Amino acid sequence: MLIEIGRKIQQARKIRRITQADLGNALGISRNTIGQLERGTVQDIGVRKLIRVLEFLGLELQTRPAGRPPTLEELRDEEIR
């Protein structure tokens, strides 16, 4: 799950042409932590910081029951983003 979230963060950041350093500076988070977050290897970023990163990039966190595959609608929404 963290790898998927990180991949989405990296995609959104690159689309907006923001460097890891610029994103980190804007949010008070180190470039190293942003890199770890994008790779899915961050140890403990905290939910509040994660949400700040997501909101800054125009993303939101969604949940679904564990083990349930995504619906066609969810997959379609994913492609649109």
What are the roles of these predicted feature ranges?
Residues 1-4:
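A detector for short, charged/polar N-terminal pre-domain segments
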Residues 8-22:
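Short basic helix-loop element that most often maps to the first helix and adjoining turn
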Residues 14, 25, 55:
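Short polybasic/polar patches that bind polyanions
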Residues 19-35:
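Short alpha-helical DNA-recognition segment
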Residues 41-46:
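Short, solvent-exposed alpha-helical "recognition" segments
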Residues 47-62:
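DNA major-groove recognition helix of helix-turn-helix/homeodomain DNA-binding modules
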Residues 62-81:
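Short, charged recognition helix plus adjacent turn
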